[in-house]
Amino acid sequence: MKAIILAGGSGTRLWPLSRKNYPKQFLKLNGDRSLLQQTVERLLRAMPAEDIILMTNSDYKFHVLSDLNSLSLSVPLPASNIILEPASRNTAPAIALGIKYCVDKLGCSEEDVVFISPSDHIIKPVGKFIKYLKQAEEIAKKGYIVTFGIRPDRPETGYGYIKVRREASGVRRQAFFDVEKFVE
């Protein structure tokens, strides 16, 4: 499995803590590591550094490099896997560019599973997430598109929801469901 971390967003919904020049992924909200650092460390528990691609933009290049350097990883992410978007165009173009890099430079094929990860989420417990990530990889290898979600504990108009239909057909895992629709 490969991973593409999306770290080019401005994350301004958490204003005044995060702002365009210093967005949410670089904040240390729950300890001594930024959300980006936590994302990288989390994914390194599931795959080698050379399988992680980090998408950002030129405005955040030095924030990204600083965050990665301060992790003191025994095997750092290859510098060539840090991709600067030529222009900020939101999520889909960033993913497309990351996939193109994966195919052109890392030799990815249609059979490879690629996990798209935001850089600004707090995910706990990490061990449980890694377990589900490995299960999701196996399901994706069967031809499914897998999305992660959490059960909301209250209504929130600023986010979309995943409406599930039932336990996923052909998949015997309690935590996986067919998606009926996405509700915005």
Mark where each language-model region is.
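Secondary-structure boundary/capping motif
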Residues: 1-2, 170
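Conserved core of the sugar-phosphate nucleotidyltransferase
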Residues: 125-184
